[in-house]
From Swiss-Prot:
Chief place where the protein resides: membrane
UniProt KW keywords: Antiport, Cell membrane, Hydrogen ion transport, Ion transport, Membrane, Sodium, Sodium transport, Transmembrane, Transmembrane helix, Transport
Protein name: Na(+)/H(+) antiporter subunit B1
TM segment ranges: 12-32, 37-57, 72-92, 116-136
InterPro entries: CPA3_antiporter_subunitB, CPA3_sub_B, MnhB
Assembly and binders: May form a heterooligomeric complex that consists of seven subunits: mnhA1, mnhB1, mnhC1, mnhD1, mnhE1, mnhF1 and mnhG1.
One Gene Ontology MF term: monoatomic cation transmembrane transporter activity
Native source organism of the sequence: Staphylococcus aureus (strain bovine RF122 / ET3-1)
Subcellular location(s) of the protein: Cell membrane
Membrane topology: Multi-pass membrane protein
Single GO biological process annotation from the record: proton transmembrane transport
Family: Belongs to the CPA3 antiporters (TC 2.A.63) subunit B family.
Length: 142
């Protein structure tokens, strides 16, 4: 993509929007087990924030921000999605039974988590990897 160098307002706005969308996507990812949201919606927002940077700058700038190979990210997501339900077997429970646990935060109250967060993380990685692989393959052909 040939981008003009005088897109200063677009580039500045894209950086601000990038961080806002990432924070909102992260909050939806964490809230997904009890309220609407989760890995799919969070993954779409993460990918859309990277698409905003790609549109405002170019693919090389987006690769500097996220140097991951998105095809590998799809594989990581699938490993999390497969390993989470299988892990319940190793804990002596039925397939896909979620286990609850608390993460102690020394000064603050402990955070209550379930293993569904790991499954949602796998969905998030798979969605981001898929969307960005499609966007990059379309963008590199131009």
């Amino acid at each position: 993509m040939n981008r003009q160098q005088n897109d200063l307002i677009l580039q500045f706005a894209a950086v601000i929007i990038f961080f806002m969308v990432m924070v909102f996507g992260f909050s939806l990812f964490l809230a997904g087990h009890y309220t609407p949201g989760g890995g799919f919606v969070g993954g779409l927002l993460f990918a859309s924030s990277l698409v905003i940077i790609t549109i405002a700058f170019d693919i090389e700038t987006m690769r500097k921000i996220s140097p991951l190979d998105f095809k590998i990210l799809i594989g990581i997501g699938l490993v999390f999605c497969i390993a989470t339900p299988i892990a319940s077997w190793f804990l002596g429970k039925n397939f896909f039974t979620h286990v609850t646990f608390d993460i102690p935060l020394f000064i603050l109250e402990p955070v209550h988590m379930t293993t569904a967060v790991f499954f949602d993380f796998g969905v998030l990685c798979a969605v981001v990897g898929t969307v960005m692989t499609i966007i990059i393959s379309i963008g590199e052909n131009e």
